[in-house]
Every structure is written in C-alpha cells, then in structure tokens.
C-alpha cells in the first residue's frame, strides 16, 4: 500500500480534521461511524489529539472475538455481521473506542463489555460508533438507533 492510497482512504485527512473542528466549534453536531475510526486515527499524535480533543474518543483496540455479534446500548441489543458472507457487510474487527473528557459510553460489545460507541454533550455534540451504522442487521434497529442519535442531538 503506497502513501497516496493510504492518504486517500484516511478516515479524517488533515483538511477534513480542520473542517470538522471548525464545524464543531461553531456548535455543529456530528455522527461518526466506521470499523476503523479508532485504529486508523491512532498512528500519529496529531490524529489522536483530533479524535480526543474534538470528537471526544480514544482508541482501545479492535474486537477480536469473532463469535460475538451483539452490541448493547440505548436500551436494546443490536447485531452486526462479523464473518464475511454474501448477504451483509461483515465487520471482522470493529474498533473499541472509549470516551474522553466528559464523553460517555453509549454502546458496548457483548460479551466483554468493551466500549463500542460514545457520545459527548458540550457546546456541540458528538456520537461516535466503532462499527459502521449501516452494518446494523435489523432495519428496525437501525431506525431506533438513528432516532436515538437524532434525539440526543436535538434535546435541550
């Protein structure tokens, strides 16, 4: 993998980090989800500072127990596909992300209780998932989770 490919697929390029920082500092709310939002941003001090200072999460490793596809949060248990298959977008090693500052955990992988998602409420709000939102298997669960996220963003 050459440097240009790695830069092209970077979760948050330097330019994107500046835009997101400015957006959040002006009171914007942001939802981030993906299998590599922690691991991809853990390589340099600058990237770690961005995720911790702006998005309010840190990286704690990847979930390696392939037998677990359950995630608990928002009062329910949801499932994501972990093993490659022909029907779903599989997530073999989703990221375990932890809250920093006054952020708090909102989802945990089960079993094991590693943090799968965090939320932050300050002058702006973040909601970050260590797995892709679109990988939630049940359409009903996706709708309920999204309603919860939007409710968090709009509550006074």
PLM feature segments, named:
Residues 1-48:
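Helical hinge/lid and interdomain linker segments adjacent to catalytic or ligand-binding clefts
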Residues 3, 37-39, 111-112, 125-126, ...:
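Short, solvent-exposed loop/turn segments at secondary-structure junctions
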Residues 8-11, 110, 136-138:
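Acidic-and-aromatic substrate-binding clefts and catalytic sites of carbohydrate-active enzymes
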Residues 13-21, 94, 146, 150:
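Short amphipathic alpha-helical segments and helix-helix/interface helices
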Residues 25-30, 102, 122-125, 156:
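Loop/turn elements at helix/coil->beta-strand transitions in domains of secreted/extracellular proteins
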Residues 32-119:
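An acidic, glycine-rich "communication" segment
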Residues 129-156:
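A recurrent domain-boundary module in secreted/ectodomain proteins
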């Amino acid at each position: 993998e050459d440097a240009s490919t790695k830069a092209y697929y970077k979760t948050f390029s330097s330019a994107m980090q500046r835009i997101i920082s400015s957006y959040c500092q002006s009171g914007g709310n942001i939802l981030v989800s993906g299998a590599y939002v922690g691991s991809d941003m853990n390589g340099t001090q600058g990237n770690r500072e961005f995720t911790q200072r702006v998005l309010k999460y840190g990286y704690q490793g990847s979930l390696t127990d392939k037998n677990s596809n359950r995630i608990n949060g928002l009062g329910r248990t949801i499932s994501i596909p972990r093993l490659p298959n022909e029907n779903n977008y599989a997530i073999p090693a989703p990221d375990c992300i932890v809250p920093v500052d006054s952020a708090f955990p909102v989802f945990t992988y089960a079993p094991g209780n590693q943090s799968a998602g965090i939320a932050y409420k300050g002058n702006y709000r973040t909601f970050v998932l260590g797995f892709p939102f679109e990988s939630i298997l049940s359409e009903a669960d996706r709708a309920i989770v999204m309603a919860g996220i939007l409710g968090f963003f709009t509550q006074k």
